[in-house]
A protein has these predicted regions:
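Amide-donor transfer/coupling interface in amidating biosynthetic enzymes
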Residues: 37-45, 83-85, 89, 118-272
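N-terminal beta1-alpha1 cap of cysteine-dependent amidohydrolase-like domains
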Residues: 1-96, 100-110, 115, 124-132, ...
Length: 272
C-alpha cells in the first residue's frame, strides 16, 4: 500500500477536542485522514472503507459516568459488527487519552483473549487528584510487537505532553501482578513514565503524573494492532509545540510524537 492510499478515520463524538490536530499529523506525513462523527458512520459510512481507526483525545459525552464509557457503549450498540470485522482483519486502531479510555471500556485493551465483554482494566481518577496538563517523559518498553512503536528503538525516551484528569491505569488489585506478567510476557507493555534519563518513576509523583500502576502510560493488544496511550503524540508533532522552544538555539523540525505516526504508516505501507 502506498502512503497516499492509506485512509485514516479519526472518529469523534460530542466532547472530542483533539480530532483536528490528530488528522493534521497524518496529513503532514502524506496520509488521507478524515474526521468523522460516529453518527455519520452509522447513517452513511462504512468503517471498512478505512485502513486505520483513531479515537482522539477530549472529553467524549462530557466524561459522564466515567471517561470513555458512554462512547464505548454507543459504539458497540451502533457499529459493533463493523468494529468486530475491523479488529478481526487486523486493521490498526489507535486510542489517544480519551481514546485509550474508550478502548479499555470497549474491552479491546488489554484484550488478553480478544475483545472482552467487560473492561479488564480501568483508567481512573489521577492520584494526586486534579487535571494534569504538562510535559512528561516516556520510555519505550516494547520489544517490537506494537505496530505503532516497532520502528522506535526499545529503551528510547520520548518527551510528550499529557492532559487528563482520569489517567491512572489500574488492574483489579487481586489480579494486578498476574495481569502485569501477561503484559510483559506477550510484549503488550509499550510506554512507562520515567525521568529524562529513562529511570522508571516507580509510582513517584510527578515523574508518574497520575499514580498509574507500574508507571503504565500505554499498552497494546496481543497482536500489536490496537494501541492506547494517555499522552498526546499529536501535541508533540512539531518543534513549536514544545514549551521550551524559545530558549533553544537549535530545534529539530519535528517532536517525538512524529515517531508514533511514522511507525504505523511505515507498517501500513508494507501491506499489500
Amino acid at each position: 500500500m502506498k502512503t497516499e492510499e492509506i485512509k485514516v478515520c479519526v472518529m469523534r463524538a460530542g466532547g472530542t477536542n483533539c480530532d483536528a490536530e490528530t488528522a493534521r499529523a497524518f496529513h503532514e506525513l502524506g496520509v488521507q485522514a478524515e474526521v468523522k462523527h460516529v453518527n455519520e458512520l452509522v447513517k452513511n459510512g462504512n468503517l471498512l472503507d478505512y485502513s486505520m481507526l483513531v479515537f482522539p483525545g477530549g472529553f467524549s459525552f462530557g466524561d459522564y459516568v466515567r471517561s470513555g464509557v458512554i462512547f464505548a457503549r454507543s459504539l458497540s450498540a451502533k457499529l459493533g459488527k463493523s468494529m468486530e470485522w475491523f479488529v478481526d482483519e487486523g486493521r490498526p486502531i489507535l486510542g489517544i487519552c480519551n481514546g485509550f479510555q474508550i478502548l479499555v471500556e470497549y474491552g479491546l485493551l488489554p484484550g488478553f483473549e480478544g475483545t472482552s465483554p467487560y473492561p479488564e482494566a480501568t483508567l481512573t481518577t489521577n492520584e494526586p487528584q486534579g487535571f494534569k496538563c504538562e510535559w512528561i517523559y516516556l520510555k519505550n518498553e516494547n520489544r517490537g510487537k506494537c505496530l505503532f512503536t516497532n520502528k522506535i528503538p526499545e529503551g528510547k525516551i520520548l518527551k510528550i505532553p499529557i492532559a487528563h484528569g482520569e489517567g491512572r491505569f489500574l488492574f483489579p488489585v487481586e489480579k494486578e501482578q498476574q495481569m502485569l506478567q501477561q503484559l510483559i510476557d506477550n510484549d503488550m507493555l509499550v510506554f512507562r513514565y520515567c525521568d529524562e534519563n529513562g529511570v522508571a518513576a516507580n509510582g513517584a509523583y510527578p515523574t508518574n503524573p497520575n499514580g498509574a500502576f507500574h508507571d503504565i502510560a500505554g499498552i497494546c493488544n496481543k497482536e500489536g494492532t490496537i494501541f492506547g496511550l494517555m499522552p498526546h503524540p499529536e501535541r508533540a508533532m512539531y518543534w513549536w509545540q514544545e514549551p521550551d522552544w524559545t530558549s533553544k538555539t537549535h530545534m529539530t523540525q519535528y517532536g517525538d510524537g512524529k515517531l508514533i505516526f511514522e511507525s504505523i504508516i511505515s507498517n501500513l505501507t508494507q501491506k499489500q
